[in-house]
Regions:
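Core SAM-dependent methyltransferase catalytic element
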Residues: 168-188
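A short glycine-rich, Lys/Arg-flanked "PGG" loop and its adjoining helix->strand segment in the class I
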Residues: 92-104
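Conserved alpha-helix/loop element of class I SAM-dependent methyltransferases that forms part
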Residues: 1-12, 26
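Class I SAM-dependent methyltransferase "Motif I" SAM/SAH-binding loop
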Residues: 17-21
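Class I SAM-dependent methyltransferase SAM/SAH-binding core
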Residues: 12-14, 24-70
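C-terminal alpha-helical "lid/dimerization" subdomain adjacent to the S-adenosyl-L-methionine
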Residues: 111-166
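A short SAM/SAH-binding and catalytic strip from SAM-dependent methyltransferases
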Residues: 77-91
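A short acidic, Gly/Pro-enriched loop at the edge of an enzyme's catalytic core
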Residues: 67-79
C-alpha cells in the first residue's frame, strides 16, 4: 500500500535483526533516495554488515548499529524484520517497540517462514525442514533470551497476529507469500 512509492521518494528505514546486512544493502541499492539503518544485537555481525555496505557502495545512505529489537533508537517510515521475529525471546516486546518507533503513517514489514496455523498442514517437505531447523536453532535461541516465548520457525499467521496486535498494532494483512515465506504488513 504505497510503500514502494515512499521508498522511491525517500524515507527512513530500520532493518531490525539485519545480521550481516544483506537485506539492508539490497534495499539501499534498490532505493538510493531512502536512508537505511540496520540494527542487530550481535556486534560481529554489524561489523560484517558495515564492510558489506562499503563494498556495495551504499555507505552514503546506509549505516549499521548494534541494538536490540526492543531498544533501537529513532523513528521510521518503514521497519523491516526479515526472518527474525520468531527467533526473539520477547517478540511482543519487539512489536511494542516497533509500534512506538513508527511515524504515524508508517509500516512494519514482517517476513517470516511460511506456515499454516495447524501442525498437520505443515507436515510437508518444506515444513519439515523448518521444524528441524527450528528445533536446533530458532527455539533454543528464543528460550535463551528474556521471556523465551519460543515461537519457532513455524508459528503460523494466527500466532504472529497475536504477537503483532499484542504490540499495539490495529491492522495486519498478508501482503505476499511463497512456498518458503510469508510477508505481513502491520500498521498502527
Amino acid at each position: 500500500e504505497g510503500v514502494v512509492e515512499k521508498l522511491e521518494r525517500g524515507v527512513d528505514v530500520a532493518d531490525v535483526g539485519c545480521g550481516h546486512g544483506a537485506s539492508t544493502v539490497l534495499m539501499a541499492q534498490a532505493f538510493p533516495n531512502s536512508r537505511f539503518v540496520g540494527f542487530d544485537y550481535h556486534a560481529p555481525s554489524i561489523e560484517r554488515a558495515r564492510k558489506a555496505a562499503e563494498v556495495a557502495g551504499v555507505g552514503v545512505n546506509t549505516r549499521f548499529d548494534v541494538a536490540a529489537a526492543k531498544s533501537y533508537p529513532g523513528t521510521y517510515d518503514l521497519v523491516t524484520f526479515f526472518d527474525c521475529l520468531h527467533d526473539m525471546g520477547d517478540p511482543t516486546g519487539a512489536a511494542t517497540h516497533v509500534h512506538g518507533s513508527l511515524k504515524p503513517d508508517g509500516t512494519w514489514m514482517i517476513v517470516e517462514p511460511f506456515a499454516h496455523d495447524h501442525l498437520a498442514a505443515n507436515l510437508n517437505p518444506v515444513g519439515r525442514v523448518y521444524y528441524a531447523a527450528s528445533t536446533f536453532v530458532c527455539t533454543p535461541a528464543s528460550v535463551s533470551q528474556e521471556v523465551g516465548l519460543a515461537l519457532g520457525a513455524q508459528p503460523g499467521e494466527a500466532r504472529l497476529r497475536k504477537v503483532v496486535t499484542g504490540g499495539g498494532f490495529k491492522r495486519l494483512r498478508r501482503a505476499a507469500e511463497t512456498p518458503f515465506n510469508m510477508v505481513l504488513e502491520a500498521r498502527p
